[in-house]
């Protein structure tokens, strides 16, 4: 009998690009929109469009995945809150995926890179960065960190990716990988879904109540508006059952 692969719905809003993806079998469908200010308003309609295109409902989904961070405060909280709301409403588990992991997977897929450093603009003169090896799967060599651009110190020869290389081009110019870094690679729901399936299959998931953003700066409580987004997602999931 064929092995049935779990179906994952993924949400990623940690940067200026909002995206959602549905990974079902070997097929992946996605939606994306730019404009960080509209993420909370755009993501639920995109999710509903995606499910309608695939001809499925949340009842056909095995887990909700989200880009947990690091990234913009508002963005990672939006993704986490909406994932929680959908998971609560549909009684589904949640799979957090580190945004830098998703970038590294995209870099491997697009460039065949085996040793990767991801650098994401953290604003305020800082970057989020991490280093990975891809050998039969993605492994973190240096875990996600927040530092000044001068603190980015990958080990050995690496391929670079992320908008940190363009935002702090002068400060990072001394890195051998800087000149060829793919600055267009950003966190995306497609890779979030792909990594989440691996984690989910390995039993690495949490309840909606335990889902949290990954902050590398100080944690901030949810605002009233963000709680309303979460409630809207929960209501949408419940109405779709």
List the predicted regions and their residue ranges:
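Extended, charge-rich low-complexity interaction segments
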Residues: 211-229
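Residues at secondary-structure transition points
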Residues: 34-42, 73-77, 81, 98, ...
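Surface "functional belts" at beta-alpha junctions
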Residues: 1-4, 27, 38, 93-187, ...
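Flexible, glycine/charged-enriched surface loops at secondary-structure junctions
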Residues: 205-209
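DPxDG-like acidic metal-binding loop motif
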Residues: 65-99
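N-terminal beta-alpha supersecondary unit
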Residues: 2-68
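Short, hydrophobic alpha-helical segments
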Residues: 51, 196-204
């Amino acid at each position: 009998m064929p092995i049935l692969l779990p179906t994952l719905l993924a949400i990623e809003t940690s940067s200026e690009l909002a995206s959602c993806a549905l990974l079902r079998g070997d097929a992946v469908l996605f939606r994306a929109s730019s404009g960080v200010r509209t993420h909370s308003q755009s993501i639920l309609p995109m999710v509903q469009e995606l499910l309608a295109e695939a001809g499925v409902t949340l009842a056909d989904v095995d887990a909700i995945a989200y880009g947990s961070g690091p990234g913009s405060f508002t963005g990672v909280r939006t993704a986490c809150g909406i994932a929680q709301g959908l998971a609560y409403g549909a009684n589904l588990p949640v799979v957090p995926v580190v945004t830098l992991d998703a970038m590294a997977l995209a870099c491997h897929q697009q460039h065949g890179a085996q040793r990767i450093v991801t650098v994401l603009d953290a604003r305020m003169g800082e970057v989020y960065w991490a280093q990975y090896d891809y050998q039969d799967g993605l492994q973190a060599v240096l875990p996600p960190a927040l530092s000044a651009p001068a603190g980015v110190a990958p080990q050995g020869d690496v391929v670079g990716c992320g908008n940190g290389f363009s935002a702090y081009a002068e400060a990072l110019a001394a890195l051998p990988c800087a000149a060829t870094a793919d600055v267009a690679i950003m966190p995306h729901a497609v890779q979030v879904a792909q990594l989440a399936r691996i984690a989910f299959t390995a039993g690495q998931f949490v309840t909606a109540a335990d889902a949290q953003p990954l902050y590398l700066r100080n944690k901030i409580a949810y605002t009233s508006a963000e709680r309303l987004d979460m409630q809207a997602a929960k209501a949408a999931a419940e109405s779709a059952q």
